[in-house]
Design a protein with these regions (language model features):
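Sec-dependent N-terminal signal peptides
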Residues: 4-12
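Lipid interaction determinants
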Residues: 16-75, 90-201, 215-264
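Beta-propeller blade signature
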Residues: 81, 203-208
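Short, low-complexity Ser/Thr-rich regulatory SLiMs
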Residues: 82-84, 237
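Short, conserved beta-turn/loop elements at beta-strand boundaries and strand-helix junctions
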Residues: 84-88, 210-214
Length: 264
């Protein structure tokens, strides 16, 4: 099922019928997924236990997901355009990962959107999984607030290290991070100490304490050690499109991460 759910997230390439009345307003915002519904032509199967957050920020989007039953995680990132006349959103994915697999070749998908009173609904009428056809419906609820910060947007990590006493280790990973409406998320694809590849994510709320410090509260994560906890993070902006962050980890190590803003 974990592979099925990931396929649902990144394979939204099939259109559904939309009437002339379906218009797409600005999609910028933060959304929690409430439910996925799969229909095999005979019955609906509903999934309400997945924890997923999605952000549309300016011209870019990002989503992160974790299954609390087994901590299997997924994320994706890319650019998007809202097509008012057709009632669709076109997403151009530049990177996605799930569990032990990743995809870094560009892919474009057209999503048909129905705006609801508190968010939106996405319907994919036909998607192939395990050689069978399904209809997929996803329901999202808007969250977040009107808070604006210099961090708002989607960022790619360019370099990061962990410092332990006199030892410095360079992280071998791909990591993205996003901020919007008082929420943050990160997604990473890493090799662990046994050289096994895995996907990790986290998302929650954040607030600016000062120009050089934020507080992040992780609501859901692949990593139990950070889920439900708050962390003070030192930040240093280098113009509007670069920043670095420094955090003292619970094990006494220090993590330093450098980011660049995604731009078209």
């Amino acid at each position: 099922m974990k592979n099925l759910l990931f396929a649902c997230l990144i394979s939204a390439a099939i259109s559904c019928n939309t009437s002339d009345e379906k218009k797409i307003p600005a999609m910028e915002g933060t959304y929690f997924m409430n439910m996925q519904t799969l229909n095999d032509g005979k019955k609906d199967t509903k999934y309400t236990d997945l924890k997923q957050l999605k952000m549309y920020t300016g011209q870019f989007f990002m989503y992160t997901q974790v299954n609390p039953k087994d901590s299997v995680s997924a994320f994706g990132v890319g650019s998007y355009t809202a097509n008012n006349d057709s009632g669709t959103v076109t997403e151009s994915v530049i990177y996605s990962a799930s569990d032990s697999s990743f995809r870094d070749d560009p892919a474009q998908y057209v999503l048909n959107i129905t705006i609801t009173s508190d968010g939106y609904q996405q319907v994919i009428p036909e998607i192939v999984m395990d050689s069978s056809n399904y209809k997929l419906t996803e329901d999202y609820k808007r969250s977040g607030d009107s808070t604006k910060t210099p961090l708002d947007g989607v960022w790619k990590e360019t370099h990061s290290v962990v410092i332990n006493g006199n030892d410095t280790t360079v992280n071998q990973r791909v990591q993205y991070k996003a901020y919007y409406g008082g929420y943050f998320m990160f997604g990473q694809y890493v090799k662990d100490s046994s050289s096994k590849s895995r996907t990790g994510i986290g998302f929650g709320t954040f607030k600016m304490i000062s120009n050089n410090e934020i507080e992040e509260t992780d609501l859901n994560s692949t990593y139990a050690i950070i889920a439900g906890h708050s962390f003070k993070v030192k930040i240093q902006m280098d113009g509007p499109d670069k920043y670095s962050q420094t955090i003292l980890n619970g094990d006494g190590t220090t993590g330093i991460e450098n980011y660049e803003r995604l731009k078209k």
